């Protein structure tokens, strides 16, 4: 008897995999297990829920039941997997177990919360479920602190500001998006946030949070404090690797996979935000879509190594949107920047004059695909 394919997780990666498998095989048994409701929503929408006045339930695109019926699969929502027996090919929960021929870990990543005094007062916005738990507090808050000036923190800071809230953005780096691009490129967005009224406390360390009669007191280094109503942690994601480790699979930044997306354990694969591919975790939609296409083929019997093209990353800051690609974080590039009122084009060139990275903004974003073709494969 065939046990088929078992997938742990129900997010974008899991759904893309199901759709790609069903395009090729209508009959292989598919089982999905996840700790949440398994309803579908678009995770990037979380960066805009406040300015759009959306409730958590408004984000649902398709219910779990509709998904199961459409793609002919068994679903087990609100079910937390506790162990994986790789030798027996068995997944275990508190009162259930499932055997598998192939197992896919699509367990995602959780929001990292700095372990400072009062860290339990921080909110996270990494899932529909998390938003649902705090949407009333976020909607009612007037003074909002965002901890983290990376991709998500910057998007959230602009969104809360567009919703008319007083926003303080805190980061230990000297500038926003410091891990993504050089200062001369990110400064345009940084100035735009300042013009909008976002108070940026850069080169700053949040030390503690204390509940007060009127809200929360955030204490920072250099004897500074700020009174706010809510604090949102946007300090990065931590891939969920615990189940992989229990199965005996190797982990580092994420769950290590080879070019076929298989872990170090036979018949166990990883996909999405939890997977570490060539030493990198790629928590973006496009690499997950492409990886899901390759993994579906490999699970069904072909052996096709994953090939990821150079891909665009989109910074969803509507007042000054950005597209970027290539090795934007490289320290040795010479940046040629064209600034105009309608947008920016920044080209990162190596010592041989070869384009290695670019960032485009606003109306100049239409040039992104031509620049993408100029990047080395």
Swiss-Prot record:
Its keywords, alphabetically, are:
Cytoplasm, FAD, Flavoprotein, NAD, Oxidoreductase
Molecular function GO terms recorded: oxidoreductase activity, acting on iron-sulfur proteins as donors, NAD or NADP as acceptor
Describe the reaction catalysed, as an equation. Answer: 2 reduced [nitric oxide reductase rubredoxin domain] + NAD(+) + H(+) = 2 oxidized [nitric oxide reductase rubredoxin domain] + NADH
> Lineage from the top down?
Bacteria, Pseudomonadati, Pseudomonadota, Gammaproteobacteria, Enterobacterales
Its cofactor is: FAD
Where does it primarily localize?
cytoplasm
E.C. number: 1.18.1.-
Give the location in the cell. Answer: Cytoplasm
Please verify whether the record's keywords include Ribosomal protein: no
The record's similarity note reads: Belongs to the FAD-dependent oxidoreductase family.
Pathway noted in the entry = Nitrogen metabolism; nitric oxide reduction
- Superkingdom, taxonomy of origin: Bacteria
Question: What is the purpose of this protein?
Answer: One of at least two accessory proteins for anaerobic nitric oxide (NO) reductase. Reduces the rubredoxin moiety of NO reductase.
Q: Which GO terms describe its cellular component?
A: cytoplasm
Database matches in InterPro entries: FAD-bd_OxRdtase, FAD/NAD-bd_sf, FAD/NAD-binding_dom, NO_rdtase_NorW, Rbx-bd
Q: What is this protein called?
A: Nitric oxide reductase FlRd-NAD(+) reductase
């Amino acid at each position: 008897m065939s046990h088929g394919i078992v997938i742990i997780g129900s997010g974008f990666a899991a759904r893309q995999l199901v759709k790609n498998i069903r395009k090729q095989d209508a009959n292989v048994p598919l089982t999905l297990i996840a700790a949440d409701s398994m309803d579908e929503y678009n995770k990037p929408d979380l960066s805009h829920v406040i300015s759009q006045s959306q409730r958590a339930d408004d984000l649902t695109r398709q219910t779990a039941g509709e998904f199961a019926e459409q793609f002919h699969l068994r679903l087990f929502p609100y079910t937390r997997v506790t162990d994986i027996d790789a030798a027996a090919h068995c997944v275990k929960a508190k009162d259930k177990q499932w055997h598998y021929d192939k197992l896919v870990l699509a367990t995602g990543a959780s929001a990292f919360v700095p372990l400072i005094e009062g860290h339990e007062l921080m909110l996270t916005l990494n899932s529909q479920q998390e938003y649902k738990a705090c949407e009333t507090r976020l909607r009612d808050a007037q003074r909002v602190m965002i901890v983290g000036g990376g991709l998500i923190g910057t998007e959230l800071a602009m969104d809360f500001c567009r919703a008319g809230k007083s926003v303080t953005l805190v980061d230990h780096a000297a500038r926003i998006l410091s891990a993504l691009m050089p200062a001369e490129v990110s400064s345009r967005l940084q100035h735009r946030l300042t013009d909008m009224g976002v108070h940026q406390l850069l080169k700053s360390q949040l030390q503690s949070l204390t509940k007060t009669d009127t809200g929360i007191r955030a204490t920072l280094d250099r004897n500074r404090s700020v009174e706010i109503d809510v604090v949102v942690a946007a300090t990065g994601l931590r891939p969920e690797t615990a189940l992989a480790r229990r199965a005996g699979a190797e982990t580092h930044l994420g769950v290590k996979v080879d070019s076929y997306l298989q872990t170090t354990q036979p018949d166990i694969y990883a996909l999405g935000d939890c997977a570490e591919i060539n030493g990198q975790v790629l928590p973006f939609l496009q690499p997950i879509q492409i990886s899901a296409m390759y993994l579906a083929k490999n699970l069904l019997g072909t052996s096709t190594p994953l090939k990821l093209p150079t891909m665009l990353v989109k910074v969803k800051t509507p007042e000054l949107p950005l597209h970027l690609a290539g090795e934007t974080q490289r320290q040795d590039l010479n940046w040629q920047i064209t600034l105009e009122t309608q947008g920016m084009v920044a080209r990162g060139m190596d010592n041989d004059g070869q384009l290695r990275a670019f960032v485009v903004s606003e109306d100049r974003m239409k040039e992104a695909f031509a620049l993408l073709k100029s990047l080395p494969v």
